[in-house]
């Protein structure tokens, strides 16, 4: 039996685990902590920090792995690409390309050089230079760590006082101690997940992103996006341009973009599965298993039977269950108004568990199907509620 090294086993990695089992790999999984949701479905667990490239490289060598599968985290992407390059394993872009795509400062420099439609960004490695830049720039601005995901460390600023605090905060969150500062674009945020084969887009899943409790962490995704054919065409052209320049390998290429009256602006790209169990509604929308095909790509297996240009159908969404304060969970109650739309759910926490970062710590997810776009937005957006978790101090 061939061996696969999977870098983590969170709820977001369950689809990768299912795919590896379907492909009959012996699954060795790593992670900082034991007991994650997917660990029990794997064959072997080695407690190790998957962001430590040299440590994971030693594990890969000692276990004679045949393939490596990244997890739902950018640091996992770095490590998987690094090890694939060192050991000659299939399925990954070269390490330098991975760094370009998954570091905001490197990607923005690449975008500027190659005329990719992305906000102009300035990078900094010290607080003084960053603050001086803000002081002579027009507000509002947005300040981000270069190497964080899920909205970590990001803040909009409207004056010098806010800028100073946000710069300190972003540097605290960045492992690399680098940040970027950009003009704030006022528009609607969307996701555009594509699958590449031979550097061409052969499938897409589109969604609108909504953030209520935390403006920088997506809370609700609705599928498909409210999007014109022109916007879709522009984004496909941009992705294929990036893929051609960087000679990207097959597999998922996801981007987030903000659209205003001037069109779409690409704010972030990534080559991995998405958080918030994104593939659950995406699979239903597209009629195929995104995680399965992504796993085949990362394992270097044939994609000859990939369902190219498969039509999407239906209206789907996920809603993140969040607490409204820190403390201990008293009870979790799914609102009755969601029952008629509910197709699945996944809980990460239970009564008695603690919540320390309520604005960014998911309690679970609801997966829903609607009969129309209008119904979906009415129930989830226009009539938004966040009262399914009762807390005690």
Please give the residue ranges for each predicted region.
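Active-site nucleotide/adenylate-binding loops and adjacent lid/helix of ATP-dependent enzymes
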Residues: 98-180, 186, 198, 222-237, ...
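Short, well-ordered beta-strand elements within core beta-sheets of diverse protein domains
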Residues: 155, 183, 283, 364-371
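Short beta-strand-to-loop capping motifs
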Residues: 158-159, 194, 321-325, 366-372
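Phosphate-binding core of ATP-grasp and ATP-grasp-like enzymes
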Residues: 170-178, 183-225, 233-266, 270-278, ...
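A structural supersecondary motif
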Residues: 253, 264, 338-351
